[in-house]
Amino acid sequence: MDDHVEHNYNTSLEEVHFKSLSDCLQSSLVMDYNSLEKVFKFSPYSSPFQSVSPSVNNPYLNLTSNSPVVSSSSNEGEPKENTNDKSDQMEDNEGDLHGVGESSKQLTKQGKKKGEKKEREVRVAFMTKSEIDHLEDGYRWRKYGQKAVKNSPYPRSYYRCTTQKCNVKKRVERSFQDPSIVITTYEGKHNHPIPSTLRGTVAAEHLLVHRGGGGSLLHSFPRHHQDFLMMKHSPANYQSVGSLSYEHGHGTSSYNFNNNQPVVDYGLLQDIVPSMFSKNES
């Protein structure tokens, strides 16, 4: 009798156990931990499954709960907002840095341009005893200014080469110590040849420089300054080049020569037309 009662009791307990467990698993996603305690006869103190509230401050929430509340916790939402904020800040910072970089580049370019303007051009100055201020040198010039010179009654005239994209300038003034001397200073380098209409005249008068030992001085200067020494005036109007200074940067070199020495040879023209000079000598 007792065995039968005990068997029925165990059977009913198994049915209740199965029914209660299946009901608990199929009831909802959030388990009823209190019913599990009744089925497995856990005490409230020893049960690892305790009813918890979806609070952010609960340390067991991320470990025991599978509810959507945990998956959308504030710990996952904040980095997105912070990431967006940081990305925005990064973009702003990059924009600021980019702007600063561009401005610094512009300043650097401006500084370079200013530095290039401050660089001194090559200058060649020579004195000529002449009654004419503006001496012919083979190039075309345009006068763009005139300025008074301190302690001198003679003004200084400024000229610019008329060829496009040529920045060569020259200034002409008379010496206040000796008004018969004209000081002509060239600045820069011509980026073009002598105009074709003046080549023949200048080449023919190249003899004036070669006479009197001037040939060695002519070849001691760069090619673009050799044309400056080819004058178009006759010896009756001036006494060739009395002195010449060559300035590059901070160094200046002076040369003196005389045009009244006896003729040694005919220079370049004798090489070109030797028959002409042989007839004259005969």
From Swiss-Prot:
A single cellular component GO annotation: nucleus
Region (Disordered): 63-121
DNA-binding stretch(es), residue numbering of this chain: 130-195
Subcellular compartments: Nucleus
Superkingdom of source: Eukaryota
Record carries keyword Transcription regulation: yes
GO molecular function: DNA-binding transcription factor activity; sequence-specific double-stranded DNA binding
Basic and acidic residues: compositionally biased ranges: 77-99
Pfam families: WRKY
SUPFAM superfamilies in alphabetical order: WRKY DNA-binding domain
Keywords: DNA-binding, Nucleus, Transcription, Transcription regulation
Signal peptide stretch: none
GO BP of this protein: positive regulation of DNA-templated transcription; vegetative to reproductive phase transition of meristem
PROSITE patterns found in the cross-reference section: WRKY
Keyword Transcription regulation set for record: yes
Family stated for the protein in its record: Belongs to the WRKY group II-c family.
Task performed by this protein: Transcription factor. Interacts specifically with the W box (5'-(T)TGAC[CT]-3'), a frequently occurring elicitor-responsive cis-acting element.
Protein's name according to its UniProt entry: WRKY transcription factor 71
Organism of provenance: Arabidopsis thaliana
Gene this protein is translated from: WRKY71
